[in-house]
A protein has these predicted regions:
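Membrane-lumen/periplasm interface segments of specific transmembrane helices
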Residues: 20, 199-236, 255-256, 288-290, ...
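Hydrophobic, aromatic-rich transmembrane alpha-helices
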Residues: 93, 252-275, 280-289, 314
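Transmembrane-helix signature of polytopic, membrane-embedded enzymes
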Residues: 95-117, 135-136, 152-155, 279
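Membrane-interface transmembrane helices that cradle and orient dolichyl/undecaprenyl
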Residues: 101, 105-106, 141-159, 191-192, ...
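Membrane-interface alpha helices of multi-pass inner-membrane proteins
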Residues: 111-112, 156-172, 178-183, 207, ...
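Short acidic/glycine- and proline-prone juxtamembrane loop motifs at membrane-interface regions
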Residues: 126-134, 299-300
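Extracytoplasmic
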Residues: 174, 219, 338-463
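Hydrophobic/aromatic-rich transmembrane helices and adjacent perimembrane loops
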Residues: 176-177, 289-329
Length: 463
């Protein structure tokens, strides 16, 4: 009876999450990256290949994971968000899978409930970004590897390797690798596998990884992928950010901060708690935390990658601290009820107005003064994505990171403008204006409309 009640509660919660996620795909655009990726995907869909023509800052795993759903569901921002939302739902199922493998299904429900009370996580489940994908692929890799550790069937190891490769090639993520190695070490230490088994598994890992690279990554072009996504990250490392920027972000998410502090406190309170399976989750969570202290440039949306392992660790630690099962389940049910009500409230109270009045006005003007095949340029890429008037492929991403790191130089920008002769140039959020000598480029343009402040639309003279 208890099992049936648990399954019923979990299924109801997952269904509520699914339907509220579906409703929220029209939530207002707050992240400029959504416009960048929408514009990039539309250019790719028009036959301008990613990396070789269309600048694409994310590694190929992001495109491979989202683009099929983007096309299948309608080639819109909402279709991309829906695809991200479906991947996040798969991640929740992976959490439940892990909790069943570790014979503590209630920790899965607690983890899901807490995740949907943490803005750093749930905001990213419906944002056209790659951070939720990293967590989902790492969770699937962990679940498969735990399954392998129990039954030693090669299929589960291969599945785990595939997902860890997908996580790596989605954002060059290495945060789960130490946990992957630790699980194999524990199997060897417990004499469940031998040295020869380890060697064979390493060979399988290398073979699968090489095959993944040859089949999925190489076709995009090694040089092109390196220049667009890998080189940009090295250039962006020089970005100046405060040393403790991570803690500035955490101060704005009280629950996540409490969970991190609680996890660290409970882990250190009694060290013998840090044994299997806690040690594998602890390794993952701590490794992400350490990396994020030093990682640059670090943005608030990156916290989603930290949230998942920390919540998993906290949920497992709570099991060990509360020997009274009734109290433990009461706490879980309380978190579940709060999260359930929160999801309903957020879905009802969140506006379905995708863009602001100013952005809509700009899009209307863009459509009035340009044709569908005209080239336009804006640093507010949601305007290009939603209007269907796209920039030159090399300017699909006019991000502050590209400009500050000189990945997009003033000379290169000027050459692209001279060659493509865009009909409209729309400086909106200060990024275009931060390009050196940007005003000189506007000598061939006249002011068409002033939306407000620095939000202007310029049209090419003679058009």
């Amino acid at each position: 009876m208890k099992d049936k009640s648990f399954i019923l509660i979990t299924v109801i919660f997952l269904l509520v999450i699914f339907f509220t996620q579906f409703k929220l795909i029209n939530h207002p655009v707050k992240d400029n990256d959504e416009g960048i990726y929408l514009t990039s995907f539309l250019l790719v869909n028009k036959g301008r290949p990613a990396y070789k023509e269309t600048f694409f800052s994310q590694p190929p795993g992001f495109l491979l994971s989202i683009y099929p759903g983007f096309v299948l569901f309608g080639k819109t921002l909402q279709s991309a968000r829906l695809t991200v939302g479906l991947w996040s739902l798969i991640g929740l199922l992976a959490i439940m899978w892990i909790s069943f493998e570790l014979k503590n299904k209630w920790t899965g429900l607690l983890s899901i409930s807490l995740l949907f009370l943490i803005p750093s996580y749930y905001n990213q489940t419906l944002t056209f970004q790659s951070d939720i994908l990293i967590s989902t692929f790492s969770l699937l890799s962990m679940a498969s590897l735990i399954r392998f550790s129990k039954f030693r069937r090669l299929f589960w190891f291969i599945l785990s390797v595939l997902f860890i490769n997908l996580a790596f090639w989605t954002k060059l993520d290495i945060t789960f690798f130490p946990t992957f190695i630790l699980i194999l070490f524990l199997l060897f230490k417990e004499k469940k596998i031998s040295i020869s088994n380890i060697i064979n598994l390493i060979l399988v890992f290398l073979t699968i990884s090489l095959g993944f690279f040859l089949i999925f990554i190489l076709p995009f072009g090694i040089k092109e992928v390196f220049n667009d996504s890998i080189l940009l990250r090295f250039q962006a490392i020089t970005s100046s950010q405060p040393v403790l920027i991570l803690f500035d972000y955490l101060k704005k998410d009280a629950l996540l901060s409490l969970i991190i502090l609680g996890s660290l406190f409970l882990s250190l309170l009694k060290r013998n708690f840090i044994k299997y399976p806690l040690n594998i989750i602890f390794t993952w969570a701590i490794f992400v935390l350490i990396i994020f202290i030093f990682y640059r440039p670090l943005f608030p949306h990156h916290l989603a990658i930290l949230t998942v392992p920390m919540v998993l660790l906290f949920s497992q630690l709570i099991v060990y601290r509360f020997k009274n099962k009734k109290l433990y389940r009461f706490i879980i049910l309380a978190c579940f009820i709060i999260a359930f009500i929160s999801r309903i409230f957020i879905s009802i109270s969140t506006s379905s107005k995708l863009i602001s009045d100013q952005q809509q006005k700009a899009i209307d003007i863009i459509k009035e003064y340009s044709n569908i095949d005209d080239v336009i340029i804006s640093d507010e890429e949601i305007l290009t994505g939603l209007s269907g008037r796209l920039p030159p492929p090399a300017l699909s991403d006019i991000s502050q990171v590209r400009i500050n790191s000189n990945n997009l130089s003033a000379e290169e920008f000027k050459q692209i403008i001279a060659f493509n002769k865009p009909k409209l140039i729309i400086p909106w959020n200060g990024r275009l204006e931060s390009i050196r000598n940007f005003k000189d480029i506007l000598n061939n343009y006249r002011l068409l409309t002033k939306i407000s402040g620095s939000k202007n639309i310029y049209i090419r003279i003679g058009e």
